Amino acid sequence: MIPRMKLFTFLATMLTAGLVLADTPAPATTQPVDLMTMTQDARCKQVVVTCLINGQPMRMMLDTGATHTVLHTESAAQLKNARWIDTSKMLFRGNSSQRPQLLIAQLLAGPGDSPEHPIMVMNLSAVRSMMAERIDGILGMDILHALPFTFDQRKGQFYWGTPVDAALTPLFAKADGTGRVIVQGQCGERKVHMLLDTGSSVTRVHTDEWAPGEGAEIGAKIGDIDHAKGIKLMEGKAGDIELGAGVAARGITPLLCDKNEPPMLGMDALRGLVLVHVPTEDSPHGLFLIAQ
């Protein structure tokens, strides 16, 4: 039996401060659901899995750049037996202008079972519009920290579990205090700091950290949880980022941003590499490993 997932401190505190959760069994599904198969979105390259939330299948993106698991508003409205929480007096912090709703439900994701999982509810229309196939939500590090998974972009294979044939080395990274990790890569003589963000299709780097310098101005369509829009921005000249001992993202051309914009290591930089996550007892985010 897989142990119940740990909750983030502020949510655990909120739940135990006056809310008692009833043991509500999830409704049985009418057909078997494959919880183990991962697919890659044809347009944006994020990895998607089917999960069961209170027994209902939901297509969820694996997003190491998200602190919390989130359901799209329309998908959340379809749930049965969910416990909705009053959020009117809660303080939320994040990069969205939306005020999230919150529900408690059973979440089955791959090999993991979180019987009473807090799930944010937000409008994900902007995110969904960027993808080839629409998703119901996002699996954040609140659940992913406890699950092993592998993105093997050498072979085009994505799966729950860890590989047996990869020479893995620790990703150069540190915790950011919210369950996520900040990659501390090396580009030439400069350190490059980026959020590890498998929910992003592109890599974005602070201009002053990109050793190869600026390239050309390009037009790009970018999206976040609130907006999807076309903008013009600078692209960096091609360069390499060392991500682990002897492992580098080679020949990448990241988008360049100023200090007010969050830098991120996206799925484009992981092409040809193997990214592995291993849960650990002594870390809120687990251990990320990488191979060439």
Which stretches of residues belong to each language-model region?
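Bacterial N-terminal signal peptides that target proteins for export
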Residues: 1-11
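Pepsin/retropepsin-fold aspartyl endopeptidases
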Residues: 22-292
